[in-house]
Amino acid sequence: MVSRSCANFLDLASWDLLDFPQTQRALPRVMTVPGIISELDGGYSDGSSDVNSSNSSRERKIIVANMLPLQAKRDTETGQWCFSWDEDSLLLQLRDGFSSDTEFVYIGSLNADIGISEQEEVSHKLLLDFNCVPTFLPKEMQEKFYLGFCKHHLWPLFHYMLPMFPDHGDRFDRRLWQAYVSANKIFSDRVMEVINPEEDYVWIHDYHLMVLPTFLRKRFNRIKLGFFLHSPFPSSEIYRTLPVRDDLLRGLLNCDLIGFHTFDYARHFLSCCSRMLGLDYESKRGHIGLDYFGRTVFIKILPVGIHMGRLESVLNLPSTAAKMKEIQEQFKGKKLILGVDDMDIFKGISLKLIAMERLFETYWHMRGKLVLIQIVNPARATGKDVEEAKKETYSTAKRINERYGSAGYQPVILIDRLVPRYEKTAYYAMADCCLVNAVRDGMNLVPYKYIICRQGTPGMDKAMGISHDSARTSMLVVSEFIGCSPSLSGAIRVNPWDVDAVAEAVNLALTMGETEKRLRHEKHYHYVSTHDVGYWAKSFMQDLERACREHYNKRCWGIGFGLSFRVLSLSPSFRKLSIDHIVSTYRNTQRRAIFLDYDGTLVPESSIIKTPNAEVLSVLKSLCGDPKNTVFVVSGRGWESLSDWLSPCENLGIAAEHGYFIRWSSKKEWETCYSSAEAEWKTMVEPVMRSYMDATDGSTIEYKESALVWHHQDADPDFGACQAKELLDHLESVLANEPVVVKRGQHIVEVKPQGVSKGLAVEKVIHQMVEDGNPPDMVMCIGDDRSDEDMFESILSTVTNPDLPMPPEIFACTVGRKPSKAKYFLDDVSDVLKLLGGLAAATSSSKPEYQQQSSSLHTQVAFESII
């Protein structure tokens, strides 16, 4: 079996991919095509090596991440590779949230350089022993993918570092982006080799694989796909600087569920989708959802937890108790503050040390009684920034120790080595306060670990001679900019840049009364112990299952090329309107009602010229000339404009301002059900709208005879939407006793009389036709926007109208392939005019003319021919 990956980004768009050598595996391959799911042939050389050979009823989760939850080392005697589970890996720990019947398949890279000649053997061993499928990236690609794009571009940007610093020069390197895309493609190939798309759930982790969902969704339109981002997501002003911003957003939107640690991260993501892709979101029954081409992409907000059992087992080790006694003796009579951080520019270690220096300056009584133990984990990245951060950390610690230290006393102790787990746990358990001062961090589980270690275990209590009923306390000083901060309501939150405030917070934590310390600890322990990693994983998967329930109730097909690919999901009955079918019905009916929207239906929405061209007028005149037809243009535009533009069509009916004004032909007078006295509400609405217009730059007010409309499409997207919501609430309150309705639409808030809509206008026309003894036996309605959905709903309800002698043939058609109440669609205005031209030709006696025109349209006639 051969895996395929991109050589460059242009190749990606054409899907002309280079070959990479890959492990031979006897695994089945399945795929879906639009509307159909089928299984392709896949050889089974050995059932024992088949990941899919387990009981088909057994739940299976495919976990995809950059690194597998494995530790690898080569046996020095045999030269063979040996593997074991990495017990500290979140990917392994999340299994606690599921039953023992759940099968897990892991896909990712190894933290070891496996030679090409050994890759097949290693792959087979990992599949048999661990249910793991390794991805082997070529060395150059791995460096460009991980150290290049992930650590050089995404990681700094997601932590709010803009690519505008002089020492970085031209920060964006497209070759690194191409490697990122190619690596994600290789990951997708591994998933495709093992997945059963009808049954399996795929859970992708973190920013390394943000375009992987696009590759998987392209191959399996109905794949059950979740993604969790373990880093921060920056504000739209930061994120929009990324040249490939849209591709990454679309990648995530090809998932069914996207998870974030905090609402702030989710809010920034939603803002980016709104500002850059024009997408709206709404909350239904507590779940946030984005409508994306007929699919609802749900947003999950839940911080990850820790593995309680793993930490408690370390607390019970004799080596941990021995280290705790050593720490107790070494720092007897002193208060311990603990910091545990990676050595990088975002963990704020130097700011923490400066705050400690300020503490000793301000609170002189703390001198000689306080020790900061700072454990420095090895840096995950390399570079000039990391070296400068390390240099500053050591110089600051040295300065503090020289100024405030003494013989046998160091106020700052840096432990810059690989610290064993038992030793780190002992420091957690003995520290009086934990200080986490990161300037930006996705989650940071250090506070959670500290809380659990301070609670202790019966085994630890016995070893340390502590009474089991003794009060437990813990104090946390945490940065406002880390993901766990919102969930720790009892912690003292600080701005890490304000070193004076941090110093004051540490002093407060150390001098706080024991009762309050105990109450804060109990509150934190209850939360952390009930929201562990198992709870987090189970909750995410439950929401993913809920998000995928509608997969097989809709018709799906893919649109777009390369990384712009997305799936359009619509009703199974939704199809392209066949010219042949409607013309046949048209000829066999005697009374027809035809309703047409104006903007976006007869005239392109994007056109600056809004007057109808000669072709539109000719088609309308021809249709209106048939005495069997009642033709109406139903629009939100004013009656004066429509009357002027459509004046050549004398027999054309017009419903202006969404049906507030109706005229049956140019020879008739305009009708309305409302008098000018009933419009007194305008004097109440206009001042309110004007105040919002003045306060919202870019907004305008449209004055109609029947309505007032506040537009905010040219305002800031977020601020405009916020103002629109507030204006809606304000007007609903002011107009509660007035005979009007307040509606919020696409970038508008509109106030109009009750009973005014395109749907009611259509009902009025059909009712009048019935009263005149000419009930329609065919009704056709074509429109393109939200207001036209009222028309579609109205004509579909006419089927059950008891006033009609028999149900008419109904053709509700929207312009553009998008979710709609209509049963049919046409692609664009050009298709609409071709359809109307076909009907006009059928009306005339020149049958050959229609046949000639119809044959030219046959290539895009029936939706079924596409399937």
Curated annotation (Swiss-Prot):
CDD domains according to UniProt: GT20_TPS, HAD_TPP
InterPro entries cross-referenced by the UniProt entry: Glyco_trans_20, HAD-like_sf, HAD-SF_hydro_IIB, HAD_sf, Trehalose_PPase
Name of the protein this chain belongs to: Probable alpha,alpha-trehalose-phosphate synthase [UDP-forming] 9
First-tier enzyme category under EC: transferase
The family this protein is said to belong to: In the N-terminal section; belongs to the glycosyltransferase 20 family. In the C-terminal section; belongs to the trehalose phosphatase family.
A Pfam family it matches: Glyco_transf_20
PANTHER family xref list: ALPHA,ALPHA-TREHALOSE-PHOSPHATE SYNTHASE [UDP-FORMING] 9-RELATED (PTHR10788:SF14), TREHALOSE-6-PHOSPHATE SYNTHASE (PTHR10788)
Keywords: Glycosyltransferase, Phosphoprotein, Transferase
Positions of post-translational Phosphoserine modification: S5
Region named Glycosyltransferase: 59-546
GO MF terms held by the record: glycosyltransferase activity
Catalytic reactions of this protein: D-glucose 6-phosphate + UDP-alpha-D-glucose = alpha,alpha-trehalose 6-phosphate + UDP + H(+)
Entry-annotated residues carrying Phosphothreonine: T32
A GO biological process held by the record: trehalose biosynthetic process
EC number: 2.4.1.15
